[in-house]
């Protein structure tokens, strides 16, 4: 089994529908969805505000490369064209972390540094728009940074207050449909 933590964001068109398309596309693999947050753009490019959320999914058939392929397919289906770095996005789907079940059934974080796949996401620990929704859906989450697992709550506390304040609750529940209850927390 592999579990994935996905960060989804959109600042063009029907932002909420774009986020919903990913949750719908995950189907029964979706096990948890954060509330939706509105966030100032990150990276210094002038543009509209983003809607962001974190989705957690499990699928025994997906290896990390397959999760990447699925994320890119969600983006293509939304009409995403890769252009300006950190520019406006119809839809952005980032793999933040992947976990595989060990022989003892514990979840083990996957690390990868290969063509177009870096896990965990190398900038996730610097992005309040990733950390805040992730904590909302999994308060005990950890992320490996510089080779050491760190509580996501600690990573968020280390960010500047202005970064944390740039992320505001937009909708308290993801409210996608009745198939995906928000309250179902991931198992660890």
From Swiss-Prot:
Pathway: Cofactor biosynthesis; tetrahydrofolate biosynthesis; 2-amino-4-hydroxy-6-hydroxymethyl-7,8-dihydropteridine diphosphate from 7,8-dihydroneopterin triphosphate: step 4/4. It comes from the Bacteria. One of its GO terms (molecular function) is kinase activity. It catalyses: 6-hydroxymethyl-7,8-dihydropterin + ATP = (7,8-dihydropterin-6-yl)methyl diphosphate + AMP + H(+). The keyword Signal does not apply. The keyword Transmembrane helix does not apply. Its EC number is 2.7.6.3. Pfam families: HPPK (PF01288). One of its GO terms (biological process) is tetrahydrofolate biosynthetic process. It is an enzyme of class 2 (transferase). Keywords: ATP-binding, Folate biosynthesis, Kinase, Nucleotide-binding, Transferase. Catalyzes the transfer of pyrophosphate from adenosine triphosphate (ATP) to 6-hydroxymethyl-7,8-dihydropterin, an enzymatic step in folate biosynthesis pathway. Belongs to the HPPK family. This is 2-amino-4-hydroxy-6-hydroxymethyldihydropteridine pyrophosphokinase. The gene is folK.
């Amino acid at each position: 089994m592999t579990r994935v933590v996905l960060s989804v964001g959109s600042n063009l068109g029907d932002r909420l529908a774009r986020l919903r398309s990913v949750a719908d596309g995950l189907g029964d693999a979706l096990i948890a969805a954060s509330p939706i947050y509105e966030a100032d753009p990150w990276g210094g490019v002038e543009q509209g505000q983003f809607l962001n959320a974190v989705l957690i999914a499990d699928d025994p058939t997906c290896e990390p490369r397959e999760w990447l392929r699925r994320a890119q397919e969600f983006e293509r289906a939304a009409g995403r064209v890769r252009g300006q770095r950190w520019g406006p996005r119809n839809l952005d789907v980032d793999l933040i972390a992947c976990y595989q079940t060990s022989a003892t059934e514990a979840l083990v974080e996957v690390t990868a540094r290969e063509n177009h796949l870096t896990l965990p996401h190398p900038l996730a620990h610097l992005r309040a728009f990733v950390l805040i929704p992730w904590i909302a859906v999994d308060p005990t989450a950890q992320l490996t940074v510089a080779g050491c697992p760190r509580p996501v709550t600690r990573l968020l506390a280390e960010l500047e207050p202005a970064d944390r304040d740039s992320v505001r609750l937009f909708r308290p529940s993801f409210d996608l449909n009745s198939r995906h209850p928000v309250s179902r927390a991931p198992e660890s």
